[in-house]
Design a protein with these regions (language model features):
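Boundary/entry segment of secreted carbohydrate-active catalytic domains
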Residues: 53-106
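Polysaccharide-binding and catalytic clefts of secreted carbohydrate-active enzymes
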Residues: 181-371, 375-380, 395-399, 403
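Catalytic domains of carbohydrate-active enzymes, especially glycoside hydrolases
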Residues: 90-127, 206, 210-212
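Glycine-rich, aromatic-flanked loop segments that form ligand/cofactor-binding clefts
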Residues: 131-184, 214-224
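Catalytic-core region of carbohydrate-active enzymes that cleave or remodel glycosidic bonds
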Residues: 344-470
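Bacterial Sec-dependent N-terminal signal peptides
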Residues: 22, 26-57, 61
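Carbohydrate-binding surface patches
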Residues: 458-459, 515-562, 599
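C-terminal beta-strand-rich structural cap/linker in extracellular carbohydrate-active enzymes
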Residues: 584-605
Length: 605
């Protein structure tokens, strides 16, 4: 997420974990503004606009077919991209201002892709003159896929100076007033507003015109965040005219046969609330006065209260974790209606004007993307039962706790992507910033920063997840070069870009068989490739301020028939190494002579 606009996630202050708003303001000033912009590029803080009663002009009609739950939303086949992703193996994260020269680290490292090289923020990036479009040309000439992008919901007052235009796009609370996020000095745009979606689409079209390979969208589902003093993320946002009109259509689509008496008995909806489901599918429910309903029942200050029977129909959002099949309005429409419209329109623009396919991705796990790009931050719900995963584990004395495996978390990301999208698309991850994960990473000694990547890049790849190596952000944090990481990143890139190596991490299938090793603290996963080779991935978690090399490790894993050969592949070896093996009882048995950080044992039938 660009600079500091990712600070708040539901229920958690995300400035370096749990910093206060005062510290946030100081951090913004110290770092020269948001998204790396200098303070001269940003307008002075603006107070909330004068009281007004209209926010986010609604669409003229319900979605095609009348709307409703996910089974009722029409999905245009054109929303899916067709560009090849099979050569995207090495991801490097470098984000900078749009007008700067190319990041020399990117060109020196030469990853397959930079998934968010630019991210439009406020008015920086709304005009072609804001961009150095030579940068994507340089990247592409070096074989690097260049992804630009924008915040999807952070809205500054100066983006729409005219009050009428601002009111047509801004998200509101249950009293009908725009929600001012005072810590960040912005509002949220309403994705339900066709005018706001067109604004985002126009920015994407401009970047496509500049020759980028694709677009990254940040905070796609944050229009429902909410903000009141002392309780950021209370969910009191998104109750604007556009969302409410769609909510009425959603209710009528979901329950088309309810009588007025049933609406009243189940939800307390009366004739005064103007929910008219007898109209044609295109317009049914769109006159629903949900804010009036909330006011009449005393729920304006807490619209998601359990006392409100419609709160369960409205739903709640965990940023970057949409649930389009959960049967709620926000779960369904944010992903399947609003996000689909943006992705489809931009894909068709590139197809019709330039005869090309573009990549589209977003921060989190979303449908309709070419690949997922998941930000890693603290307080996430990524673990079992919604528990938080620590993506940069520390020991009590502040060192890297390399004994901790992230393999299960990476596997869960891939599984979630398949569930939400319905297809198997590549899954990438990056250390989001500024977050406690980034803070913990930056606090590591230089050698342990290096070890972090040596351990967790291959552990992610073992799950067929692509972990971005961090080059630069717009916070003024130390770059990879300043941290002494460029030699490692260049060597790692060269190793995994080698076609015979890259092939081990695409079109894989996780196998249920168990990999056994003669030593403890070895992370392992067994995969099968499309050519039927079997790969046993071994990650060494014997670690204490450095890898504890394991020699002579006995390893066994199941394969259907005796292999023709077994080869060891590792960035810690000088070259791929043929290995003697035995086969009996459906098990391949080998002895790995040296396991430093990672070894792939490749069995070829």
């Amino acid at each position: 997420m660009p600079a500091l606009n990712l600070i708040f996630r539901p229920g958690r202050n995300r400035v370096f974990g749990r910093a206060c708003s005062l510290f946030l303001a100081v951090a913004i000033a110290r770092c020269g503004g948001l998204s790396g912009q200098t303070s001269t590029n940003l307008p002075p803080p603006s107070p909330p606009p004068a009281t007004q009663s209209t926010c986010a002009t609604p669409a003229a009609s319900n979605p095609v077919g009348g709307g409703g739950t996910y089974t009722q939303i029409a999905i245009d086949p054109g929303v899916y991209g067709k560009r090849d992703t099979s050569e995207l193996t090495v991801f490097g994260f470098s984000q900078q201002d749009q007008n700067l020269p190319a990041d020399p680290q990117v060109l020196a490292m030469s990853p397959n892709i930079v998934p968010r090289a630019w991210a439009r923020w406020d008015r920086s990036g709304v005009q072609p003159s804001d961009y150095n479009f030579d940068y994507p040309k340089q990247a592409q000439a070096a074989g690097i896929t260049f992804i630009a992008g924008t915040t999807a919901t952070a809205l500054f007052r100066d983006e729409f100076p005219a009050a009428s235009k601002f009111n047509a796009v801004v998200s509101c609370d249950a009293t009908g007033q725009p929600v001012f996020h005072s810590a960040m000095k912005f509002y949220r745009g309403s994705l339900a507003s066709p005018a706001y979606r067109q604004y985002l689409i126009g920015i994407g079209e401009m970047q496509i015109d500049g020759g980028v390979d694709g677009l990254f969208f940040d905070e796609v589902d944050f229009s429902y965040q909410g903000a009141i003093s002392g309780n950021e993320d209370n969910g009191d946002e998104g109750f604007d005219d556009a969302d409410i009109a769609d909510f009425g259509g959603f209710l009528c689509g979901k329950y088309p046969n309810y009588s007025p008496a049933e609406w009243q008995s189940k939800y307390g909806i009366t004739a005064a609330d103007n929910l008219n489901c007898s109209k044609p599918a295109a317009t049914r429910g769109r006159t629903f006065n949900y804010r009036g309903y909330l006011a009449r029942n005393g729920w304006q200050a807490s619209p998601l209260t359990a006392s409100n029977p419609l709160a369960a129909e409205w739903g709640t959002i965990i940023g970057g974790h949409p649930e389009p099949q959960n049967g709620t309005f926000t779960g369904t429409y944010t992903s399947l209606v609003y996000w689909q419209d943006i992705a489809l329109t931009l894909r068709n623009y590139a197809r019709q004007k330039y005869k090309k396919e573009i990549y589209i991705t977003a921060n989190g796990v979303f449908p309709f993307v070419d690949f997922q790009t998941i930000g890693l931050w603290g307080g996430n719900p990524d673990g079992p039962g919604g528990s938080s995963v620590n993506y940069c584990p520390h020991t009590a004395d502040g060192h890297l706790d390399g004994k901790q495996s992230l393999l299960a978390a990476f596997m869960a990301m891939k599984q979630r992507s398949a569930r939400i999208d319905g297809r198997v698309v590549p899954v990438a991850a990056f250390i989001d910033w500024p977050t406690d994960v980034m803070t913990d990473y930056l606090s590591l000694p230089s050698s342990e920063k290096s070890d972090y990547w040596r351990m967790y890049v291959p552990e992610a790849l073992a799950a067929t997840v692509y972990l971005n190596m961090h080059l630069a952000d717009t916070m003024g944090d130390p770059t990879a070069k300043q941290s002494g990481l460029m030699p490692l990143f260049q060597q790692t890139t060269a190793f995994y870009k080698m076609p015979t190596h890259a092939a081990l991490y695409h079109n894989t299938r996780d196998l249920p068989g168990r990999v056994t090793a003669s030593v403890a603290n070895i992370g392992a996963n067994l995969t099968q490739l499309s050519d039927e080779r079997t790969v046993a991935h071994l990650i060494n978690h014997n670690y204490s301020q450095g890898f504890q090399e394991q020699d002579g490790v006995s390893v066994s894993f199941p394969v259907a028939k005796a292999p023709r050969s077994v080869t060891l592949v590792s960035p810690d070896y000088r070259a791929d190494t043929p290995l003697a093996f035995t086969y009996s009882g459906g098990q391949v048995r080998v002895t790995v002579p040296k396991l430093v950080a990672y070894v792939a044992v490749v069995s070829e039938n």
